[in-house]
């Protein structure tokens, strides 16, 4: 079936951001057409939630395509114009099971040339792990916190550090964890004031929120 591609090429001019492509629910044919359309405008392709079958197809088509399997993301083309800023973003994750979402956020920021660092496996079940990294994390200007299960990490970080905090509930856990809904509700009802909360597993959205913040304060 043919379909009209209405890609938002003006988004970069309006917002300084590009439109990412959601790979999960698109066919290989749709992705190929979208990539061709985007690249014809000398724009960068950034695909989220893409599996290895679709990624390998695009890797065969484009020499400069890169598949980041752990992040389930694929890029084609040169990096975007670098964001001229000395501001830094820390991405903090509760456990290694949160890694895909953490790396999605990190890759999105790195594509824009943002200086960022991931702090992996510092969840509240072993609070000493977070405390041992706290001095280093405090050197960053914006914090993204990714956590599944009960999602308490965002509240703890929000009670210890003053930076803008973007919380990402992760669909890790079983039973009452409800694919991230418990973490989402926990973050939304946090007693640490001023925490911004993204949708479940939205690492890319968290990265774009962080990008808006550092652009506005640079």
Roles of regions detected by a PLM:
Residues 73-75, 115-136, 181-182, 198:
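Glycine-rich oxoanion-binding loops at beta->alpha junctions
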Residues 132-170:
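Glycine-rich phosphate-binding loop
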Residues 93, 97, 134-138, 142, ...:
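C-terminal binding/interaction regions
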Residues 84-126:
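Glycine-rich phosphate/diphosphate-binding loop of Rossmann-like nucleotide-binding domains
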Residues 29-31, 98-103, 127-128, 147-157, ...:
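Short glycine/serine/threonine-rich phosphate/pyrophosphate-binding segments
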Residues 1-65:
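Long amphipathic alpha-helical segments
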Residues 61-63, 160-161, 191-193:
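Short, structured coil segments at secondary-structure junctions
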């Amino acid at each position: 079936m043919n379909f009209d591609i209405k890609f938002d090429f003006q988004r970069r001019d309006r917002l300084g951001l590009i439109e990412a492509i959601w790979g999960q629910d698109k066919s290989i044919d749709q992705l190929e057409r979208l990539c061709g359309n985007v690249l014809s405008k000398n724009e960068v392709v950034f695909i989220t939630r893409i599996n290895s079958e679709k990624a390998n197809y695009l890797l065969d088509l484009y020499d400069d395509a890169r598949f980041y399997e752990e992040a389930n993301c694929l890029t084609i083309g040169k990096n975007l114009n670098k964001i001229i800023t000395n501001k830094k973003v820390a991405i903090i994750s509760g456990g290694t099971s949160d890694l895909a979402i953490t790396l999605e956020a990190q890759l999105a920021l790195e594509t824009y040339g943002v200086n960022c660092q991931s702090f992996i496996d510092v969840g509240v079940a072993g609070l000493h792990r977070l405390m041992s990294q706290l001095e280093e994390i405090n050197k960053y200007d914006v914090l993204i916190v990714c956590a599944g299960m009960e999602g308490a990490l965002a509240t703890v970080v929000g009670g210890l550090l003053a930076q803008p905090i973007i919380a990402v509930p992760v669909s890790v856990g079983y039973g009452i964890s409800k694919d991230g809904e418990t973490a989402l509700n926990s973050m939304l009802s946090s007693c640490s004031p001023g925490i911004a909360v993204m949708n479940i597993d939205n690492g890319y959205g968290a990265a774009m929120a962080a990008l808006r913040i550092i652009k506005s304060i640079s």
